[in-house]
Amino acid sequence: MKIKRLLCLALVPMIVLMSSCSGGKENQAVTQSTEAEVDYSGTVLNVCDRFAGNNPPSSLGYLNYSRLSTDTGIKFITSRYFIDETKVKLLANDSDVDIYIVASSEVPDYMSAGYYTPIESDVIEKYIDSCHKVLSELAYASDKIAFMPVSLSINAILIPISAISETEVTPEKIEYLDDFLKFVREYDGNRIAYTNSSSLFSDLENQYEILYFSDTSNKDINFITPEYMHIYSEILSYTNSDDKIGATLGFEHNLTGDYSNNSEKALCTFGSYSSAENFTDKRLNTDPNVYMTSGSTDFFEKWRAFPIPKISEEVTSNSASAAFAFINPFSENKDAALYVLETIASDFYKYAGNNSKYSMMFSDISAYPDYFYTDSNIFSDYFEMLKNAKLSKFVFPAARTDIDDYQAGKLTLEEAVAEYQRQVDIWLNE
C-alpha cells in the first residue's frame, strides 16, 4: 500500500536526521527459546496497526487480535500512527509501541536507519521462505530477519467472463494503458465500465516510479515528463459532484456504481482478491443498491482478472503492495512480541485480520485455505501476476493538493504536475 501524507514542516529536520542515525541504541538479536515454554499471560502489547485503529482493536486490521489473545494469553491494544508520526516516535526512542506494521514503501528507510530488531527464529525463517519472493526481498537486514510480511495484495482489471465472450477482449489486447482506455471508450454495448480512478492512478504512478526511480539518493527525480503527464491527464481529468464521485472519462466510479459487482451489467471494474466478498449478481427486489453477497461465489465463477495496463513497453513487472511487521527496537517486551510474530508465522490465515485474510502470501498453492477457491481461473490470474510483481520501496510524503486543484480547474495540467514536482523536490532536499 502506498500512503501519501503531508509531512509537518516542523518535523522535517528530525525526519532527515533519522536517515543518518543508527537507531539510538544497539539492536540486539532476539531469539525465542524453543526448549522451554514461557507464560506471557497478562502481558500487554501495543501494535501500531493503521487499519485496526486506536484501542480497542477493530476487526478491520491486519491481524485477528481476539484470536491471538486467546491463543497466546497476551492482551493487545492497538494504535494508529501514520508515516511521519511513526518516524518521530522511533527517532525519540519511544517504547510504548511494541510491534509496528508498516507499508513496504517505508521499510527501506527504517532498514537503513537501523530502526528494527534483528530476529533469529526458525519458525519465521521457514514462513518467509514459503512466501512469494517479492516479500522475502524486504524481510532481511544484514542477513538477519528484520521485517516479517503480513500482507500482500495486487490490483487488477476485473472483467466478467460473459463480457469477455461478448467483446473477445484478451489481456494482450489491453496490455497497455492507451489500448485499455480505447477498449472502454469505443465499447458500444449495454454494459458499464467501472473503475476506482484514484487507485488506478496510484498503480500507474507506482509503475512510473519503479521504472525510473530505483532509489532517491541522487535527488534527481523528474515527474515533468510527457509520459507522467499523459497518465495524469488521462486518469485524473474528472470532477466530483456533491452526490457522486467522479471517474475517468468512459467510466463510472466503482464505489457509486450500482452494478460494478454484477457480471451481467459490468464491462469491467477494478479491485484486488479481497473484492471477492463484495461480488454478486443477486439483488433484493431488483434494487441495484441492495445486493446479497452472503454465500456468493460469483467472483470465482463469473469473473477473470487482467493485469493493470502498462504505461509503456519498458514496464516488465506488476505493481503490488505489502505490509511488514517489525519489533520496535525500544520495546520493553521484545520476547513477547517475537512470540506473537512466531505464532502468526506458524498459521498465517488463522491469525489474519480482515485486511489480510485474502493476501496471497505463499508460493505454494496448497498453503491457501478453502475460501480462496484455488481451482478457479481468477485465483490463477492473480497468482500468476504475483509471480512477476515488484513493490514500491519508497514514498513521497506529499498531500497531493495538486490533484485537487487540477480537478477543480485551479491549475492546468502543466501547473499541477509542476506543483507536485515542487513538493517532491522539497522532500528530497530538506
PLM feature segments, named:
Residues 288-360, 401:
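Extracytoplasmic/periplasmic substrate-recognition and gating elements
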Residues 70-131, 167-168, 260, 267-268, ...:
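Extracytoplasmic "Venus flytrap"/periplasmic binding protein-like
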Residues 5-9, 19-108, 335, 351-353, ...:
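Conserved N-terminal structural module of periplasmic/extracytoplasmic solute-binding proteins
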Residues 218-254:
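Glycine-centered hinge/linker elements that transmit conformational signals in sensory
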Residues 146-150, 155, 178-224, 229-230:
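Extracytoplasmic/periplasmic solute-binding protein
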Residues 102-159, 300-309:
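Hinge/lid segment of periplasmic solute-binding proteins
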Residues 15-16:
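Hydrophobic core
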Residues 353-405:
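Long, aromatic- and glycine/proline-rich binding clefts that accommodate carbohydrate-like moieties
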